[in-house]
């Protein structure tokens, strides 16, 4: 019976192994946290070129692109740090998960299958805002190009106002699914104004 009991040496060996396994698990948990945090920050950074703060709205398309970037980053970082991450099973799982996430993100961003009326417009508003920012601030010398930029600014501002009105109207009254309903709730006319001068 005494022979069956664990010896002090056995206990020491087992205890010495536990921290090592724990450290390995912590490394992979930190890796996942690093990728997740980076994805959140990348999504937020994509709004850095928004013309004004009110144009920052949820965009499913940008979220899908964040999935693509996160999946790509996970594979690249793992490849460069294989010396730190030595669990083949975990590494294969990360690689396969990243491929699956990349495929899902590609399908969603190209098919737009989950994007409806309101989510489409809320994604288009920050997209239009980029055009306003670049068209207002670009160092343009050619008068023809300047006039084109002004037209773009005015059109994008007008369309942003229209989309914001439509989002509010749909939230309050539901979609106008027929021409009769649409005609009874016409979109107001907005006039976009450019700050840029081409004189």
Identify the role of each PLM range.
Residues 2-199:
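His/Met- and acidic-residue-enriched segments that coordinate or traffic transition-metal cofactors
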């Amino acid at each position: 019976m005494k022979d069956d009991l664990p010896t002090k040496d056995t206990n020491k060996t087992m205890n010495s192994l536990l921290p090592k396994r724990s450290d390995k698990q912590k490394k992979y948990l930190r890796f996942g946290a690093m990728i997740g945090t980076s994805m959140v920050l990348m999504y937020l950074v994509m709004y850095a070129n928004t013309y004004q703060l009110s144009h920052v709205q949820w965009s499913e398309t940008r979220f899908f692109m964040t999935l693509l970037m996160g999946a790509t980053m996970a594979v690249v970082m793992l490849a460069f740090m294989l010396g730190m991450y030595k669990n083949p099973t975990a590494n294969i799982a990360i690689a396969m998960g990243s491929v699956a996430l990349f495929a899902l993100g590609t399908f969603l961003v190209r098919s737009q299958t989950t994007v409806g009326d309101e989510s489409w417009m809320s994604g288009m508003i920050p997209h239009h805002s980029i055009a306003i920012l670049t068209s207002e601030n670009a160092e343009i010398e050619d008068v023809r190009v300047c006039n084109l930029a002004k037209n773009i600014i005015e059109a994008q501002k007008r369309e942003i106002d229209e989309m914001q009105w439509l989002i509010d109207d749909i939230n309050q009254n539901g979609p106008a699914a027929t021409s009769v309903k649409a005609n009874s709730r016409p979109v107001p006319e907005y006039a976009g104004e450019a700050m840029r001068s081409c004189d």
